[in-house]
Amino acid sequence: MKIIYNIPNIIRMAGMERILAIKANYLAGLTGMEVVIITYEQKNLPLAFDFSDKIRFYDLDIDYAACRGKNIFWNKIRRIIYTKRHQRRLEEILLKEKPDITISMMTGREREWLYRLKDGSKKILECHFSYFSYQNVKGIINRYKIKRFLNKIKYYDRLVVLTEEDRKDWGRKDNIVVIPNALTFYPKESADLSIPRVIAVGRLSAQKGFDRLIAIWAEIEPYFPDWKLTIIGSGELQDTLERQIG
């Protein structure tokens, strides 16, 4: 069996990229399994995680960042051109590789149209975010785009979510399955719970909501002065969060 994963790039040490590395390496080590990973904006940068030598990579070299200029008209034209280029290059690889399953990690542009490619493979969306992250987007145009995308999910063979709660949030769709993230280690000892400390671990980005955690902690801290909050992680909002902490 051959599986192809689609993801924009693997240049950050983030959760989704880590899970992809874990699963791809595991699958590539199984007898009779082939794994291919397709990016479109890797830009010759090194991979953030180690991957098995058995895994093959393609980069489609599509620079969607060029569609974010000041001229709205040319942005639209470029987006159309780059999308067509993306579709053509990806379909060429799928027809060449003949995968059994093609997966979109749901952060790339291909999620909008992957189901339309007629290469014969099963098309799967793999969601690593909560349903509500798609519901809480700001702006009329962005909300319209999200609604349009959500209406396309029914055309995919499967939508993979992480938990039973996620499955319920997505509603009554027959093509939803639950596959939790892999656990690569299990603690040998349990904490003795003697230290009054809360630890939060994650990428310091808007998606993780550390700003809300800090705001809530500021309200409850006076009632629990012995407790400490420790945030572990890095990301684009580190300076902003440090200023919020003061």
Predicted segments — roles?
Residues 88-92, 140-159:
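Membrane-proximal helix-turn-helix segments that form the acceptor-binding/catalytic region
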